[in-house]
């Protein structure tokens, strides 16, 4: 089975990790090294950004 292509680009994920304060872990251990809580916070923030962009488009 092939892996599903990620929805978020690596650049966007790195920006979110920097914003949320765990980019150092990503650099040292890769994405597998982050805590589940950090991954959840990253997804939550990505959703917030997407919602803001949709609201701007609909105005």
Swiss-Prot record:
Site (Cleavage): 15-16
Biological process according to GO: DNA topological change; sporulation resulting in formation of a cellular spore
PROSITE patterns: SASP_1
Superkingdom to which the source organism belongs: Bacteria
Keywords recorded for this protein, A-Z: DNA-binding, Sporulation
Any one Pfam family match given in the protein's UniProt record, by short name: SASP
Molecular-function annotations in GO: double-stranded DNA binding
Family label: Belongs to the alpha/beta-type SASP family.
Job description of the protein: May play some important role in either sporulation or the dormant spore.
Full protein name: Protein SspF
Organism field: Bacillus cereus (strain ATCC 14579 / DSM 31 / CCUG 7414 / JCM 2152 / NBRC 15305 / NCIMB 9373 / NCTC 2599 / NRRL B-3711)
Recorded name of the encoding gene: sspF
């Amino acid at each position: 089975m092939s892996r599903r292509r990620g929805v978020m680009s690596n650049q966007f994920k790195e920006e979110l990790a920097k914003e949320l304060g765990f980019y150092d872990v990503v650099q040292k251990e890769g994405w597998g090294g982050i805590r589940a809580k950090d991954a959840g916070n990253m997804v939550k923030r990505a959703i917030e950004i997407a919602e803001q962009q949709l609201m701007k488009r609909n105005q």
